[in-house]
C-alpha cells in the first residue's frame, strides 16, 4: 500500500471497531499512543513526517474513536488488532514508534510476528509491571485531578463512560501478570532494530528495567534521559526527539 491519504475512518478489524488514519508516502510507520491517549497525540507529528513515511495512526481499542469495550484493555489484544490492521491495509512489514502503552503494544507485535516489525522506537515501555507501577495503577483512577478529566474528555468522544472503562483497566493492570510478561529469552526473539528511550526518574518503570531490556534485544540502543520521568521526551524536548527518532527509523 503506497501513497495513501486518509482523513480517518472506522472499520471492523479483528472483531472490534477501530479508528485509524493513513497519511503520507514512503515506508509504513505505525504511531501508537500511550494508554488513555489517542491518535490526536500525533497530530503535529503526522504533518512533519508525512513526506518521510506512510503513517498509520490508530486509536487503540477502547481509546478515542475506537469506542468502548466491555472488558479491560490488554496490550496483547491491542497488538493482535494492529497486526490485523496491517493485514487489512495490505502492509507486510512496518516500522513503529510507541509511547508508554503504545510501546508495550509494539513489544507484543515484535514478538508475535518478528518479521513484520523492521525497526521500532520505544518510549517509556516496559517488559513487565514492577511493584511500584502496580501500586500507582491501583490508585490512579481514584486520584485523577479535574484538569486531567478534561484532557481525557477531549480525547475520548464517548465521554465519561468511555473514560471510566479505561480507568478500570488500570486496576486490572495492577493484578495482571500475563499481559506484560516478557522474559529476556522472549525479548531476544525480536528482530527489529530498537531504540529504547527512558527517563532515569520514571516513577513507574525504574531505568534498570530498560537497561535489562536493551541487553536482551539483540539490535537495540538505549537512550537514557537524565532527570526524565515517564514519557521524558514529551514537552519541550519533543521536536528534538522526533528528529532523532526519524533518523533512527529511516536508517533501519
Where are these regions (language model features)?
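Catalytic active-site module of serine/aspartate enzymes centered on a nucleophile-bearing elbow/loop
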Residues: 220-221, 226-252
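Flexible "cap/lid" loop of the alpha/beta hydrolase fold
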Residues: 104-112, 118-150
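Acidic catalytic loop of the alpha/beta-hydrolase fold
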Residues: 201-205, 231
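Active-site nucleophile elbow and catalytic-triad environment of alpha/beta-hydrolase enzymes
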Residues: 169-186
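Conserved HGGG/HGGXW glycine-rich cap/lid loop of the alpha/beta-hydrolase fold
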Residues: 16-67
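Active-site loop/oxyanion-hole signature of alpha/beta-hydrolase fold enzymes
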Residues: 23, 47, 56-97
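Short beta-strand/loop motif that positions the catalytic acidic residue
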Residues: 190, 196-198
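Short alpha-helix in the alpha/beta-hydrolase fold that links the catalytic acid
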Residues: 192, 206-215
Amino acid at each position: 500500500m503506497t501513497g495513501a491519504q486518509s482523513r480517518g475512518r472506522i472499520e471492523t478489524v479483528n472483531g472490534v471497531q477501530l479508528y485509524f488514519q493513513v497519511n503520507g508516502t514512503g515506508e509504513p510507520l505505525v504511531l501508537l499512543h500511550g494508554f488513555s491517549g489517542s491518535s490526536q497525540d500525533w497530530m503535529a507529528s503526522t504533518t512533519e513526517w508525512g513526506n518521510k513515511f506512510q503513517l498509520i495512526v490508530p486509536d487503540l481499542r477502547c481509546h478515542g474513536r475506537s469506542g468502548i469495550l466491555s472488558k479491560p484493555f490488554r496490550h496483547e489484544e491491542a497488538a493482535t488488532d494492529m497486526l490485523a490492521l496491517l493485514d487489512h491495509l495490505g502492509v507486510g512489514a512496518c516500522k513503529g514508534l510507541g509511547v508508554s502503552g503504545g510501546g508495550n503494544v509494539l513489544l507484543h507485535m515484535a514478538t508475535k510476528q518478528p518479521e513484520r516489525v523492521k525497526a521500532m522506537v520505544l518510549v517509556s515501555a516496559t517488559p513487565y509491571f514492577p511493584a511500584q507501577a502496580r501500586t500507582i495503577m491501583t490508585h490512579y483512577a481514584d486520584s485523577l485531578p479535574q484538569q486531567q478529566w478534561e484532557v481525557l474528555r477531549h480525547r475520548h468522544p464517548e465521554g465519561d463512560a468511555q473514560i471510566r472503562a479505561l480507568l478500570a483497566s488500570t486496576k486490572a493492570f495492577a493484578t495482571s501478570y500475563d499481559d506484560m510478561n516478557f522474559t529476556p529469552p522472549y525479548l531476544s526473539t525480536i528482530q527489529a532494530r530498537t531504540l529504547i528511550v527512558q527517563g532515569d526518574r520514571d516513577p513507574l518503570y525504574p531505568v534498570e528495567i530498560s537497561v535489562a531490556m536493551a541487553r536482551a534485544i539483540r539490535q537495540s540502543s538505549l537512550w537514557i534521559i537524565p532527570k526524565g520521568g515517564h514519557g521524558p521526551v514529551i514537552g519541550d524536548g519533543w521536536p528534538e526527539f522526533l528528529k532523532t527518532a526519524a533518523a533512527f527509523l529511516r536508517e533501519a
